[in-house]
């Protein structure tokens, strides 16, 4: 039976295909396929000499380099399981990885060796030196199902987990992605922004070139957009692999001239928004822009666009031999165009997570990716969001990526992330974090245009209430957005903020001890202003203050720096307020005034001036109001005129002596009898109301109908 050892299979294939003298890696030096396999066989012998054997574990904590590739293959050659760790992590994370894997050997750099147990650590340089003095070793006989290596998940749903892969796994996703999607040949050279210790980078930079006879450009330092431009101009790669965040920065900071050698661009890690994909098409001169989806558990991409068949705005179609299904909330398979959870099944899915009881696969070998997608009748997959990205606002699910797609259409915005944040009241509201495009400024004017644009294109509950400009968004080392971190932080540079107060109880507005009966009126009728004159002056000042307050809150929501630039007589809808904004304005005014306001009061009174008149009456202690600010009848006998007179009566009643209030109450009873006519029910209410406060409540409940 043929040996299933992956290192041996790759070396055998390179020899038989005549690739030994072809470049495999472009780094500080050009390293051929033959040099890689010869060096790996020698390093395997070094591991054997150090006492390592089949079943042992090695932790590789190194930057990208041809040495790392040879060390990985050496582990596989000897049947040793390799764990690829990120060397840029904190020392505590490295200590955790070492405790979790209990490696027989840690291979790292001089700068990091003090982070690990001295008796188990070796520098890569010393192993390479030893390898130069030994003969190449053989390949441990292994079955295809034998454990080979582990890469760590990105950590978007908790602490990273080491997903275990077998010797046969890379051959599966090499066949799916390299041959079926990208059509890679020995003439292709790849350049990848993701590092080798991630599944995406490991496939693109190691398994793909080794399995196809092609090559990869390797950089020991992170591949920034600027570094990618320099490396591309120097080595002329044909395929550029990256994540959307990386590509957005390439457009922002690089010249297309550096990338003229490319025949296609491959994106993964997060869905590539249609707007960004179109910009990439223009930037790279119309070459295929291929989005796809994979996972650490699968090992590489399993749904992708292909160089000979691709659609912007989609993830492409499933790559054989994988199977996918979209699962509805009830567990059934969703129909075409129906959103659900993406499940995948295939031969390369991880066997499990190291040192953890949970398994990545569910029933009958299916893996729930926790990505929400829909599939059309032709099999094209469109990404929606992460299952754990969905935000809930007021009991309604919101896909934040729908909002983000619209925000980044603005040229001033390079990146956007929308999350739900918890207000001090306990209510949830959406908040947008924005990263400005290089050289651009996101100021109040840009923000106002963004906000109004979102209101025109989205339901109001999907529009963020708070915005902040930040220098960068929190991401995992391989570029995935960490929404959980954003949910925990407050904006560092707030652009504007709608602070929601406790929702009203639904009862009619009530005053909080602000009526004239609780004020001390100085002076009497001897020479000074009369009581009536003082009350009129008091009301005029109160009206001015209330109008100022309403204008100020409305201006904040509209992004207007000058409150008085807002037209007080225009309808709220003409000012740009929708129903949600109007409700929010009333909640803000409730917090400012201390009143409890019905949520519909803004629409009831229609404009800033109408709402201000209503609020002024409430603050004066008035309860007798109507449901419309406009007159119901024409002339002075209209209900609006009656309400105005009742307001004046209430102001006077508030300051008369207690002994006079009973006489006023009697008059009001008689008035109510006249209004009600022969209605027996109202007559009973009048008889039961024995105090002025009860009379006023009766006016509120009966005349306000």
UniProtKB/Swiss-Prot annotation:
Organism: Mycobacterium tuberculosis (strain ATCC 25618 / H37Rv)
Sites bearing O-(pantetheine 4'-phosphoryl)serine, chain numbering: 579
GO annotation, biological process: Actinobacterium-type cell wall biogenesis; fatty acid biosynthetic process; glycolipid biosynthetic process; lipid biosynthetic process; phenolic phthiocerol biosynthetic process; secondary metabolite biosynthetic process
Entry function: Catalyzes the adenylation of p-hydroxybenzoic acid (pHBA) to form p-hydroxybenzoic acid-AMP (pHBA-AMP), which is converted directly to p-hydroxybenzoyl-S-FadD22 (pHBA-S-FAdD22) thioester intermediate in a CoA-independent manner by attack of the phosphopantetheine thiol of FadD22. Usually, this intermediate primes the biosynthesis of the phenolphthiocerol (PPOL) by presenting the pHBA starter unit for elongation by Pks15/1, but M.tuberculosis lacks Pks15/1 due to a natural frameshift and thus is unable to produce PPOL.
Pathway(s) of this molecule: Lipid metabolism; fatty acid biosynthesis
Gene inactivation effect: Disruption of fadD22 abolishes the production of PPOL.
PANTHER family named in the record: ACETYL-COA SYNTHETASE, ANTHRANILATE--COA LIGASE
Keywords annotated in UniProt: Fatty acid metabolism, Ligase, Lipid metabolism, Phosphopantetheine, Phosphoprotein
Gene: fadD22
Annotated catalysed reactions: holo-[4-hydroxyphenylalkanoate synthase] + 4-hydroxybenzoate + ATP = 4-hydroxyphenyl-[4-hydroxyphenylalkanoate synthase] + AMP + diphosphate; 4-hydroxybenzoate + ATP + H(+) = 4-hydroxybenzoyl-5'-AMP + diphosphate
Any single GO CC term annotated in Swiss-Prot or TrEMBL for this entry: membrane
Name recorded for this polypeptide: p-hydroxybenzoic acid--AMP ligase FadD22
Family annotation (InterPro entries): ACP-like_sf (IPR036736), AMP-bd_C (IPR025110), AMP-bd_C_sf (IPR045851), AMP-dep_synth/lig_dom (IPR000873), ANL_N_sf (IPR042099), PKS_PP-bd (IPR020806), PP-bd_ACP (IPR009081)
Family: Belongs to the ATP-dependent AMP-binding enzyme family.
A GO MF term: acid-thiol ligase activity
Carrier domain segment(s): 541-619
EC number in record: 6.2.1.50
């Amino acid at each position: 039976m043929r040996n299933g050892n992956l290192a041996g299979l790759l070396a055998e294939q390179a020899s038989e295909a005549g690739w030994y003298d072809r470049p495999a890696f472009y780094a500080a030096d050009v390293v051929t396929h033959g040099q890689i396999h010869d060096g790996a066989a020698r390093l395997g012998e070094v591991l054997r000499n150090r006492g390592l054997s089949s079943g042992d574990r090695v932790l590789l904590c190194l930057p990208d380099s041809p040495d790392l590739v040879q060390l990985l293959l050496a582990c596989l050659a000897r049947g040793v399981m390799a764990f690829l760790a990120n060397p840029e992590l904190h020392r505590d994370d490295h200590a955790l990885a070492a405790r979790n894997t209990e490696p027989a050997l840690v291979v790292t750099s001089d700068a990091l060796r003090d982070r690990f147990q001295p008796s188990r650590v070796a520098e890569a340089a010393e192993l390479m030196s030893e390898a130069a003095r030994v003969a190449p070793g053989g390949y441990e006989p292994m079955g295809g199902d034998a454990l080979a290596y582990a890469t760590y998940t990105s950590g978007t749903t908790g602490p990273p987990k080491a997903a275990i892969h077998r010797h046969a796994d890379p051959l599966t996703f090499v066949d799916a992605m390299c041959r079926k999607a990208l059509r890679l040949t020995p003439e292709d050279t790849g350049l990848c922004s993701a590092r080798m210790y991630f599944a995406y980078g490991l496939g693109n930079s190691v398994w793909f070139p080794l399995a196809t006879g092609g090559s990869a450009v390797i950089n020991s330092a992170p591949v920034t957009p600027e570094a990618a431009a320099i490396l591309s101009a120097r080595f002329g790669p044909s395929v550029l692999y990256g994540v959307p965040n990386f590509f957005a920065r390439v457009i922002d900071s690089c010249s297309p001239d550096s990338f003229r050698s490319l025949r296609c661009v491959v994106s993964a890690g997060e869905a590539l928004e249609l707007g960004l994909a179109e910009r990439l098409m223009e930037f790279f001169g119309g070459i295929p822009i291929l989005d796809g989806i994979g996972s650490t558990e699968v090992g590489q991409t399993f749904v992708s666009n292909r160089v000979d068949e691709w659609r912007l705005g989609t993830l492409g179609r499933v790559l054989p031999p994988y199977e996918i299904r979209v699962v509805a909330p009830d567990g059934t398979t969703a129909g075409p165009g129906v959103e659900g959870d993406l499940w995948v099944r295939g031969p390369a899915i991880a066997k499990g997570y190291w040192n953890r009881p949970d398994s990545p696969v569910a029933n009958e070998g299916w893996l729930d990716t926790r990505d929400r997608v829909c599939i059309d009748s032709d099999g094209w997959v469109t990404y929606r969001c992460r299952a754990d990205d969905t935000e809930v606002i007021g009991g309604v699910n919101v896909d934040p990526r729908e909002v983000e797609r619209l925000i980044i259409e603005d040229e001033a915005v390079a990146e956007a992330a929308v999350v739900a944040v918890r207000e001090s009241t306990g209510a949830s509201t959406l908040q947008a974090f924005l990263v400005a495009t290089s050289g651009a400024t996101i100021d109040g004017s840009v923000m106002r245009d963004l906000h109004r644009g979102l209101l025109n294109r989205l339901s109001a509950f999907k529009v963020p209430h708070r915005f902040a400009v930040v220098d960068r968004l929190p991401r995992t080392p391989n570029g995935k957005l960490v929404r959980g971190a954003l949910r925990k932080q407050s904006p560092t540079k707030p652009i504007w903020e709608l602070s929601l107060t406790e929702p009203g109880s639904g009862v009619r507005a009530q005053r909080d001890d602000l009526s004239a009966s609780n004020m001390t009126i100085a002076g009497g009728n001897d020479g000074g202003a009369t009581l009536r004159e003082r009350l009129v002056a008091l009301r005029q000042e109160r009206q001015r203050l209330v109008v100022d307050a309403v204008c100020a809150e409305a201006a904040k929501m509209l992004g207007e720096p000058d409150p008085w630039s807002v037209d007080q007589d225009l309808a709220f809808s003409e000012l740009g307020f929708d129903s949600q904004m109007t409700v929010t304005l009333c909640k803000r005014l409730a917090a400012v005034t201390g009143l409890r306001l019905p949520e519909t009061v803004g629409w009831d009174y229609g404009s800033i001036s109408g709402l201000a008149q209503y609020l002024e009456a409430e603050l004066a202690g008035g309860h007798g109001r109507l449901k419309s600010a406009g007159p119901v009848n024409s002339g002075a006998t209209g209900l609006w005129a009656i309400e105005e007179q009742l307001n004046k009566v209430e102001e006077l009643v508030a300051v008369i002596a207690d002994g006079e209030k009973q006489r006023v109450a009697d008059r009001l009873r008689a008035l109510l009898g006249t209004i009600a006519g022969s209605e027996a029910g109202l007559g009973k209410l009048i008889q039961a109301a024995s105090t002025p406060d009860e009379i006023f409540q009766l006016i509120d409940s009966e005349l306000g109908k």
